[in-house]
A protein has these predicted regions:
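Residues forming the flavin
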Residues: 1-72, 117, 124-541
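A conserved beta-strand/loop capping segment in the N-terminal third of enzymes
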Residues: 69-88, 93-133, 183-187, 336
Length: 541
């Protein structure tokens, strides 16, 4: 750190929240430093879809889309309800007030935003619900990271010039000219990047990459392989951190404050099991997501809240062991999810949080579909009809009759036969009378618009039939350190721990146990990190 001023604001974590917190700190006169325990940066944010849910954002205004703070607040009140002070009126209001300003100021620093204009809120019929509140980063050339590209956390997904609103059209690319044109457009943009010697980043990777470029432009030091060991408290205030290094423990000054943005505890099985009844084995979160900030915060008296909450998500385990957090596989017509009794129990096209939560008490279930479904749609990245390899490696179970399929899967045969008969009867009328699948615009977003009369709900009639296991996974845990509307961490008695802030999945969620829209994890992580840094610098809303 030769030549660098002594840091006065320590940010823990290099996900989107931590990077934004450091940027806000520098823009408001602080001397931040970012520490990251892993040898790579980006956290779970880099592995995510990269959506940022910001009601009443500047891009909506630019596009002439009506929204307001009041509509956003009405929607949060309707979807979240009363879950205690983690989602107080003051915290909801702070999020809605500061989010649009954060978006605008990051754009001034060079961040390229775009809107997903077709993406609905997850409960679009609730008061204040809207379409198009989700933002994302534009496709970005990874080579602009310079040497930081070598240490960026990467997923197994290939680098493509994808966009959020293009994703729902990929699985139906061979069903409509519009969807096929979208696929060709994605491929064309990807090739254009490559022909210019560039590497296209999308989704979570463009989000963290663009933020890291701003961090480097502002001269903010980032230290990898530097796990937080403890917080130093002097006279009731956090004034420094102790980190672990190859040379032993080291103290880093934080005279103005510390911002914890170190993620959740999805991958600490021993810590998680008594709190949530699951170990995290079905979570695609970062392997470094082990609750360090939670434990270190508690050591200085911090209060925890909503520790049972997670961003639940039905997942499948691919033959190579990769956890696939897919969406369209369960929303396209011709597929259903059943439990071991052969029964449906949820609207499969609903929010992934709702579907995943419904699966929790049932354990692993089965996604069942017919040949027509398999011949029409992509399954993950596997094109239609290309089925043999997935049958040969055991990922798909197949049979010529439903009773035979049930026997192979350990599903109650009578239950499955009765369920499919019921589904086929309802699908012929286009109305899911049991779970209302396809009754709102969110259900239809990942549907097949060429399938009539219901783009998200169809029968299972053509043999052979198929099934694959689906598990109650999650994208991240949500519970964490209780914080107020300024992102200040609170003690059990509600008093403020001076100098300590928290945002993201190590803070108790302003969204409570629900998930209002795409980007309702990254949005609060970034906005409350922004709020924390500005408050620490003496700037208030």
């Amino acid at each position: 750190m030769a030549g660098q001023p002594e840091p006065d604001f320590v940010v823990v974590g290099t996900g989107a929240g931590g990077l934004v917190g450091a940027i806000a700190a520098r823009l408001n006169g602080l001397n931040p430093i970012i520490i990251e325990k892993a040898p790579v940066w980006g956290g779970t944010s880099a592995l995510s879809g990269g959506g940022v849910w910001i009601p009443n954002n500047p891009l909506m205004k630019r596009d002439g889309v009506e929204d307001s703070l009041e509509a956003g607040l009405a929607y949060l009140d309707a979807t979240i309800g009363d879950v205690g002070p983690a989602s107080s009126h003051e915290r909801r209001l702070a999020y809605l007030q500061e989010g649009p300003e954060m978006v605008a100021q990051l754009a001034e620093q060079g961040f390229g935003w775009r809107r997903a204009p077709r993406y609905p809120d997850y409960y679009p019929d609730y008061p204040g619900g809207r379409v198009g509140r989700t933002l994302e980063g534009v496709n970005f050339d990874a080579k602009r990271l310079g040497p930081w590209l070598n240490t960026m956390r990467r997923s197994a997904m290939p680098d493509m010039a994808l966009s959020t609103d293009a994703a729902p059209q990929i699985p139906t690319a061979f069903r409509s000219m519009k969807s096929f044109a979208t696929l060709l457009s994605v491929m064309g943009r990807t090739i254009a990047f490559r022909l210019k010697g560039q590497v296209p980043l999308a989704l979570g990777k463009t989000l963290v990459a663009q933020l890291m470029v701003i961090v480097q432009k502002l001269g903010i030091p980032v230290r990898l392989n530097t796990p937080l060991h403890s917080l130093v408290e002097e006279n009731g205030r956090i004034t420094a951190v102790v980190v672990k290094t190859a040379r032993g423990e080291e103290r880093i000054s934080a005279a103005r404050g510390v911002l914890l943005c170190a993620g959740g505890f999805a991958k600490d099985a021993a810590y998680r099991l008594p709190l949530q009844g699951v170990t995290g084995e079905w979570s695609p979160a970062s392997p470094d997501d082990t609750g360090d900030a939670h434990k270190i915060g508690v050591a200085v008296g911090a209060q925890l809240a909503l520790m049972d909450a997670a961003t639940w998500f039905p997942v499948s385990i691919m033959p190579d062991g990769v956890i696939n957090a897919g969406i369209w596989e369960r929303t396209l017509p011709g597929s259903i999810i059943v439990d071991p009794a052969g029964h449906r129990f949820v609207n499969e096209a609903a929010s992934y949080v709702d579907v995943g939560q419904a699966m929790l008490n049932r354990g692993p279930c089965w996604l069942v579909f017919d040949s027509r479904y398999r011949n029409r749609y992509f399954f993950g990245s596997t094109p239609p009809r290309m089925t043999k390899a997935l049958v040969d490696n055991g990922f798909f179970v197949t049979a010529s009759t439903l009773p035979e399929l049930a026997a192979k899967c350990g599903i109650d045969a009578d239950g499955l036969v009765q369920t499919v008969a019921r589904v086929n009867d309802m699908a012929s009328r286009g109305v899911d009378e049991d779970f209302q699948r396809g009754n709102n615009v969110y259900d239809l977003y990942y549907g097949d618009p060429t399938h009539k009369p219901n783009a998200a709900f169809g029968g299972l009639e053509q043999t052979p039939f198929f099934a694959t296991r689906v598990y109650p996974g999650d994208l991240s845990t949500k519970g964490g350190l209780m914080a107020d509307e300024h992102a200040r961490v609170l003690r059990e008695d509600g008093s403020v721990i001076d100098g300590l802030y928290a945002a993201g999945n190590c803070a108790a969620p302003v969204m409570g146990r629900t998930y209002p829209g795409a980007g309702a994890t990254l949005g609060p992580a970034m906005v409350f990190a922004w709020i924390a840094a500005r408050h620490c610098a003496g700037v208030t809303a």
